[in-house]
Design a protein with these regions (language model features):
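N-terminal "assembly arms/tails" that initiate or stabilize quaternary assembly
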Residues: 1-87, 240, 301-324
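Extended serine/threonine-enriched, polar tracts that run as long, contiguous segments within proteins
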Residues: 184-187, 195, 202-264, 269
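Extended, solvent-exposed, turn-rich assembly/linker loops in the middle of proteins
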Residues: 139-219
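Signature of extracytoplasmic/envelope-associated structural regions
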Residues: 4-5, 40, 44, 67-73, ...
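Short helix/loop capping segments that flank catalytic or ligand/cofactor-binding pockets
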Residues: 64-67, 106, 189-192, 198-199, ...
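Extended, compositionally biased alpha-helical segments that mediate assembly or anchoring
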Residues: 244-324
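Alpha-helical scaffold segments that mediate packing/assembly in large oligomeric complexes
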Residues: 101-172, 289, 295-308, 318-324
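Long, contiguous amphipathic alpha-helices that act as assembly "spine/axial" helices in icosahedral shell
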Residues: 56, 81-143, 172-181, 254-277
Length: 324
């Protein structure tokens, strides 16, 4: 990959250094990545020849009971069956001008500062995309949804008992759930009852928060509609991730006549961010462009369940934070 340069040198960026650092920091800066909810998966390797769908075959769970060994009875032979999970390839870009990046460029290590800045932007964009994706995908996994928002009075409100019920949606697999993503208003409700545990390092620095033993992820992008909040519970690796390579993942551009000379740093990424076990099954005409939009991934009609419900390590929990 060639080194990128600009006329003034303000955005003299070396992709071989910038890109790996930015990609690594994106996962670190995302709470979903830091908690282990998003994990890289070898089977999500993006084909080098492009294509908008990544197909992942898997073996179906074996069904049927054990059989009695009897000399007068033949054993029945059960079949191994396969199915497929399908993920969609996302293509996104971030573009900022040197005016927007002035503070980062003024520092002692401007390239590191730029990479940190872009990684933070990507982390926020990924979290937003993931929430839209979950809203669409989880609508087809009804076994993993608990909705108490329509109950009367305080029965519709998030509390410890209702949270146990949400966990129970996973049955005897509930111990696989390790994280909970919630709106800050939900976190505030829990904190008022002193049920948040603050996990700190040996120097007293806050590492993360926990609720009932599950790492708390707070994001005000979590859905709220008519006083109904959507909270998600996750297992490790519930969301699969893989990074592709656009033809030009990083480049600079210069407009010499704009504002006395404006430079731009363009970051392009091809990636998969996929709720494991819920396959991308787009309706006719989707995506309208080369890659799907947030609105398209939020549409339930573009998803279909692939795994058995308990093997999908996500639970959707709808509730209120005050009696209606």
């Amino acid at each position: 990959m060639a080194t990128l340069t600009t006329t003034s040198g303000d955005l003299d960026v070396i992709p071989e250094i910038f890109l790996p650092y930015m990609i690594e920091k994106t996962s670190e800066k995302s709470e979903f990545g830091a908690s282990g909810v998003i994990q890289a998966m070898p089977e999500l390797q993006i084909p080098p020849n492009g294509g908008d769908i990544v197909t992942m075959p898997f073996w179906q769970d074996l069904t049927g009971d054990d059989q009695l060994l009897d000399t007068s009875t033949d054993l029945d032979v059960a079949k191994f069956t396969t199915s497929v999970d399908k993920a969609v390839l996302h293509g996104r870009a971030l573009v900022y001008g040197s005016t927007d990046l002035a503070a980062a460029l003024a520092g002692s290590d401007p390239i590191k500062a730029l990479a940190d800045l872009y990684a933070a932007k990507w982390a926020r964009a990924w979290q937003k995309l993931l929430i839209y994706t979950l809203n669409g995908a989880m609508a087809v996994v009804t076994d993993n949804v608990l909705d108490i928002s329509g109950l009367s009075g305080t029965a519709a409100v998030f509390d410890a008992s209702a949270f146990v019920d949400a966990n129970q949606k996973m049955g005897d697999c509930k111990d696989k759930l390790v994280a909970i993503a919630m709106h800050s208003a939900v976190e505030a409700l829990i904190a008022k009852s002193d049920q948040i545990d603050y996990i700190k390092d040996s120097e007293g620095k806050l590492l993360y928060k926990e609720y009932q033993g599950k790492r708390v992820i707070v994001d005000d992008g979590m859905p709220v509609s008519g006083g109904v909040y959507t909270t998600y519970l996750f297992g490790l690796g519930a969301v699969g991730y893989s990074e592709g390579t656009p033809k030009v993942p990083l480049e600079t551009s210069r407009e010499p006549l704009l504002n006395g000379g404006e430079e731009y740093l363009i970051s392009r990424r091809h990636f998969v961010l996929h709720p494991r076990g819920i396959k991308w099954n787009p309706s006719s005409g989707v995506p309208a462009k080369d890659v799907p939009s947030n609105v398209e991934v939020a549409a339930s009609g573009n998803w279909a369940q692939a795994y058995e419900s308990q093997n999908i390590r996500i639970v959707q929990f709808k509730h209120r934070i005050a009696a209606a």
